[in-house]
A protein has these predicted regions:
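Short, well-formed alpha-helical segments that are part of the catalytic scaffolds
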Residues: 11-25
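A conserved acidic beta->alpha catalytic loop
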Residues: 34-44
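Glycine-rich, basic loop-to-helix element that forms the pyrophosphate-binding segment
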Residues: 58-77
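Short beta-strand-to-loop acidic/aromatic patch adjacent to the donor-nucleotide binding site
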Residues: 79-90
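Conserved donor NDP-sugar-binding/catalytic core segment of glycosyltransferases
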Residues: 90-126
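Short, flexible, basic/aromatic active-site loop/helix in glycosyltransferases
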Residues: 131-167
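A short, conserved alpha-helix in the catalytic core of glycosyltransferases
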Residues: 160-162, 168-218
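Active-site-adjacent helix/loop segment of glycosyltransferases
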Residues: 203, 207-278
């Protein structure tokens, strides 16, 4: 059984309608858990639009905690695969089925992400190394001219985004999980209200399973990261990244070093760098 979940918080109507259409068109998704963290339960009405919807009006406990709630309910109902969705997505009807077929054929994969593109169809570079504090500083606070070389490596821009890759950090906007893998790592770490939960869960699954970028299908990610445009959300982002580095280590993180080294070696980064591919 394939299940899915989305978390809402005062989400615009057009976004919800767009992602719901994508889910409904994906005939293989048997249940969709809509976790609504909004102050009111206005979205309760959508439960009447389809028999697959399970609506929960929830206290705003955060992104990861809300998806954990959905995944616990999904596991109780026998789900074997679960898709964590952002509400700002649009995708074709074959995407989920194709990812399911891939996971069925590769039992060593615990988490897969399709190609992610923006509204214009341009690739978003969302396959990344496990971040260090300096990666965050370069990305957030320095001019693009300073951060270009760092991003080239950190976001694996030197790699071919038309080819499958094993990656230790996959974006949280579309996460296709093997339920067994999620249960093994006990889901998202609920200490993180939002933002680093995708880094954290990918690296924990990566320890036991392959975590794979699979570009044969793609998803439209329609809106930019809110923390780039909102001082309030930037503050939330930074607070949660501090919690992340307190958990895993600011300077000394041997697992980060190991995962990144293995990833760069598999992608032949040294030879590509020598060849001047940028």
């Amino acid at each position: 059984m394939i299940t899915a979940s989305i978390v809402l918080y005062n989400t615009p109507k057009f976004q919800v309608e767009t992602v719901l259409k994508s889910v409904f068109d994906s005939k293989c998704i048997e249940k969709l858990y809509v976790i609504d963290n909004s102050p009111n339960d206005w979205w309760r009405c959508i439960a009447k639009t389809s028999s697959i919807i399970r609506y929960v009006h929830n206290e705003n406990t955060g992104y990861g905690a809300s998806h954990n709630l959905a995944m616990r309910k999904a596991a109780e109902e026998g789900s074997t695969y679960h898709v964590v969705l952002n509400p700002d997505l649009k995708f074709d009807s074959n995407v989920v089925q194709t990812l399911y077929d891939f996971m069925e054929a590769h039992k060593d994969v615990g988490h897969v992400m399709p190609k992610i593109v923006n509204q214009e169809g341009e690739v978003q570079y969302l396959c990344k190394l496990v971040p260090s504090p300096s990666d965050l500083i370069f990305k957030r606070f320095l001019p693009k001219s300073f951060s270009k070389n760092s991003a080239y490596k950190f976001q694996l821009k030197f790699a071919d985004y038309d080819k499958e890759m094993d990656v230790p950090y996959l974006s949280g906007c579309f996460m296709f999980f093997r339920m067994e893998a999620v249960q093994k790592v006990k889901g998202f770490d609920e200490r993180f209200f939002m933002y680093p939960e995708d880094i954290d869960i990918t690296r924990r699954i990566h320890k036991f399973y392959r975590t794979v970028y699979y570009p044969k299908v793609f998803v439209y990610h329609l809106h930019a990261a809110e923390s780039y445009h909102s001082k309030k959300m930037l503050k939330v982002h930074m607070q949660n990244m501090i919690k992340y580095f307190n958990k895993w280590g600011w300077i000394f993180d041997s697992e980060r070093k190991q995962f990144n080294k293995e990833t760069l070696e598999k992608l032949d980064y040294k030879n590509l760098k020598k060849g001047g591919r940028k």
